Regions:
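Amphipathic alpha-helical interaction surfaces in cytosolic regulatory modules
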Residues: 29-101, 188
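Conserved beta-strand-loop-beta-strand hairpin that lines the nucleotide-binding pocket
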Residues: 90, 94-95, 100-102, 118-121, ...
Length: 252
């Protein structure tokens, strides 16, 4: 069945304004995703006018941070929502959307907000199941920190990224998804594999041991860390609180 969601587009050299009208339901999410994917690639800066968008399926609001992440995340892609109804704004807040995708009231300057770094920035990379993955992970980390103009966390994060990705290659033997996030509370590294199994934990090792100490290093650097198990794998996440994103909400 065809979605009843309608869209209009206004194209400027430095941004695109997309206006959606109609109910956001399961079918409409497909339409919204397709339109936003196209314009987040070029020019990469999109204002979404949702003032005429109804809300029938609240989980559909997750399409906004999801499509931003798929497009490369800030600053490769920039996305702002404008003019939500009171109910939609409440649902956006409840689903944790605004830290990644700024939301402005109708009449506020969405153009100016488009130029500012969101409170929480996030990027991810998919890495193959081979010995080159840790090196590729470090390179992605360096590129991301440079793009965010935030390299405070690099020394510790490089160790964490290397150890977690190496652990996936050597023990899970699957491809993995590396996620990097930065907000006012710190930097977060997450690595997801695709092999079900027990959560990895540091095991006692002799002081002279040359291998098997990776998770001990991770635990010593982390302010918090844990494992989330999925039906098809697990995610290890690590928070480094000593390198918070002090420049959040700054203009580019």
């Amino acid at each position: 069945m065809v979605s009843a969601m309608r869209s209009g587009v206004e194209i400027a050299p430095d941004r695109v304004v997309v206006r959606f009208a109609g109910a956001l339901d399961r079918r409409a999410v497909v339409h919204v995703r397709r339109i936003l994917r196209a314009y987040l690639v070029r020019p990469g800066r999109v204002i979404v006018d949702v003032s005429e968008m109804g809300l029938e399926w609240p989980p559909g609001l997750d399409v906004f941070p999801a499509v931003l992440t798929a497009a490369g995340g800030w600053p490769v892609a920039c996305l702002v929502l404008s003019g939500p109804t009171t109910r939609m704004r409440e649902e956006l807040d409840a689903r944790g959307v605004p830290p990644m995708v700024p939301v402005v009231a109708e009449g506020e300057s969405a153009e100016r907000r488009l130029l500012m770094r969101p409170t929480r920035v996030y990027r991810q990379a998919h890495l193959p199941a081979d010995l080159a993955a840790p090196r590729a992970a470090r390179e992605f980390l360096r590129q991301t920190c440079a793009a965010w103009a935030h390299e405070t966390c690099l020394p510790a994060a490089e160790v964490v990224v290397t150890e977690l990705v190496t652990n996936v290659v050597e023990h899970a033997g699957t491809a993995c998804r590396l996620g990097l996030a930065l907000d006012r509370s710190g930097c977060e590294v997450s690595v997801r594999d695709f092999r079900p199994g027990p959560a990895p934990r540091p095991r006692p090792r002799p002081a002279e041991a040359r291998r098997g100490r990776g998770l001990h290093l991770v635990a010593s650097l982390a302010d918090e860390w844990d494992t989330v198990r999925h039906t098809d794998g697990k995610t290890v996440w690590v928070r480094l609180a000593g390198c918070a994103g002090e420049g959040a909400d700054r203009e580019e």
